[in-house]
A protein has these predicted regions:
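Conserved structured core elements
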Residues: 1-5, 51, 76-86, 104-108, ...
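ATPase catalytic-site recognition across NTP-hydrolyzing enzymes
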Residues: 1-46
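C-terminal nuclease/phosphodiesterase catalytic domains that cleave nucleic-acid phosphodiester bonds
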Residues: 6-10, 14, 58-59, 109, ...
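Flexible loop/turn segments at secondary-structure boundaries
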Residues: 14-18, 50-55, 65-68, 80, ...
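Nucleic-acid-processing active sites and adjacent nucleic-acid-binding tracks
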Residues: 28-38, 51-105
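Short, conserved catalytic or adaptor-binding loops enriched in Gly and charged residues
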Residues: 34-35, 114-117
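Active-site lining segments that contact anionic ligands and/or coordinate catalytic metals
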Residues: 40-43, 52-55, 96, 170, ...
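A structural signal for short, well-ordered beta-strand segments and their strand-loop junctions
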Residues: 45, 100-102, 151
Length: 207
């Protein structure tokens, strides 16, 4: 190895350079937007980090026309509690089709705290392994097809997207790495918005 470095100009691969990133930078950058969030069918995604130290809240909007939008709404240490998150979600029950919540620590408590408000069947979703793989595919496909955008000032979401790696899961893969929590929450929100049959924004017409 030392000889190769000195004589041949060869260096051992650096992990950061060879890591199997989940989202190519050029594809992510092509979906950046400076336009404000559109109106449309809305869902929220909540992801507790693997070590339980952080929680990310994201939203996704699918308008009648044009690309969907994903947004990082908040990212906080779980040491601050989750009362703020439960209150925030309960205040917006009438505006969203669903909230998708995933993680090991904090999920049960959050679901319990919003249960009295989020009563509609299917409004609170706890994704299975299959759902997590599907949510990842939903976001990556949307990025590849340029059918989703993200706001250019969302640096935390940007950093998460560009540093997340592919993590094997149940025969497929999902987002992984030390900073994947925001992009995971975004994928859950978009998947929820696309698959939920509930849409509070639509007024039923009779006759």
């Amino acid at each position: 190895d030392g000889f190769a470095r000195e004589r041949l100009g060869w260096w051992s691969p650096v992990y950061e350079k060879t890591q199997n990133y989940a989202i190519p930078a050029d594809i992510w950058d092509a979906c950046v937007s400076d336009e404000l969030k559109p109106e449309g069918k809305t869902a929220y995604g909540v992801k507790f980090s693997g070590d339980g130290s952080m929680v990310a809240l994201c939203g996704a909007v699918i308008p009648d026309n044009g690309p969907a939008r994903i947004s990082l709404i908040d990212l906080r240490p779980t040491g601050h509690g989750i009362g703020w998150l439960a209150s925030w979600l309960n205040e917006r029950y009438g505006k969203a089709c669903c909230v998708v919540i995933d993680g090991r620590n904090g999920v049960d408590v959050l679901v319990e705290r919003i249960a009295d408000t989020w009563k509609m069947k299917g409004s609170v979703i706890r994704p299975t392994t299959r759902d997590m793989i599907a949510a990842t595919s939903t976001l990556t496909n949307a990025l590849n097809e340029r059918s989703v955008t993200w706001f250019h000032q969302q640096e935390a979401l940007n950093d998460s997207a560009l540093t997340s790696a592919k993590r094997p899961l149940g025969g497929g893969w999902c987002f992984g790495g030390d900073n994947s929590t925001p992009i995971e929450a975004a994928s859950l929100a978009l998947w929820g918005a696309q698959n939920s049959k509930r849409n509070p924004n639509k007024v039923m017409r009779i006759g």
